[in-house]
Amino acid sequence: MGITIKKSTAEQVLRKAYEAAASDDVFLEDWIFLATSLREVDAPRTYTAALVTALLARACDDRVDPRSIKEKYDDRAFSLRTLCHGVVVPMSVELGFDLGATGREPINNQPFFRYDQYSEIVRVQTKARPYLDRVSSALARVDEEDYSTEESFRALVAVLAVCISVANKKQRVAVGSAIVEASLIAETQSFVVSGHDVPRKLQACVAAGLDMVYSEVVSRRINDPSRDFPGDVQVILDGDPLLTVEVRGKSVSWEGLEQFVSSATYAGFRRVALMVDAASHVSLMSADDLTSALERKYECIVKVNESVSSFLRDVFVWSPRDVHSILSAFPEAMYRRMIEIEVREPELDRWAEIFPET
């Protein structure tokens, strides 16, 4: 009825692997590559925890099937969830290595909670599939090549080396990130609303901000006759409309907002946003009941941002990227979006002077 990994044994092996990962400088490159790929933006956050747990189980007992998820699967299976929740997660907090997922039970999520073994997993998000296949293939190789506990231990050490590196990077960024983050927001706010091409820069800013959150963001030139959706910037998910944003550099009335919400929902959008930044604009935020009325009337979610800085703060809150990644990627994304929407050259140069690494 499966194999039970003793908690004390697992803790001892994991601690030893962590110490080796923290002190060694030569690791198995294929496992380093796999663990690094699981830190990409599209990679599900739970996969690193699953990989660490599977390798730990095999490093404790070489009879273990590393692709098992639930102990009931067969006589070589172990409980991925029990070992992860009982040993891996608490020790990641104690020792300070990053698992990607921050919850106490990362295995209690798709696709792991509903299957007994990796071979049974058939339903997984399209973007997640390549990462699941990589993990599954790597663990299958462990079994096919009959990894010993020592070989599994070395693979675990390599994966933990990446976990430690990520944790250290986050710690370094966290020390100064509040200042740097505030600086990026303030510099972008000042740049966008001053100089030439303010409407274009506003739209580029929204598109670049959404690039930090979503993978498919559509932004077209202002007054482009080929526009086939209401709004200036759209997010498309699996070919279907998800979110549309109206970007305005002048005052917007409640009537104007309702007209946009109406046309957006008619086009199939159920998430509708307005991003307006104009000195003449009279705030719409003082009457939340009116926003709620629009939501009830048109059966959608309505979001209003009334400054560039407000919008960018939301980006930092909701993006799946870490702060360091946004700080690195946003200036380049903003530059690219400005070129796309045909912002004039002097403004591009001004942006490049603010962020010279763009």
Curated annotation (Swiss-Prot):
UniProt enzyme class: hydrolase
GO molecular function terms attached to this record: type II site-specific deoxyribonuclease activity
GO biological process, one term: DNA restriction-modification system
EC number from the UniProt entry: 3.1.21.4
Keyword Nuclease: yes
Keyword Calcium: no
Catalytically driven reaction(s): Endonucleolytic cleavage of DNA to give specific double-stranded fragments with terminal 5'-phosphates
Keywords for the protein's UniProt record, in alphabetical order: Endonuclease, Hydrolase, Nuclease, Restriction system
Domain of life of the native organism: Bacteria
The name this protein goes by in its record: Type II restriction enzyme SacI
Organism of origin: Streptomyces achromogenes
Classification lineage: Bacteria, Bacillati, Actinomycetota, Actinomycetes, Kitasatosporales
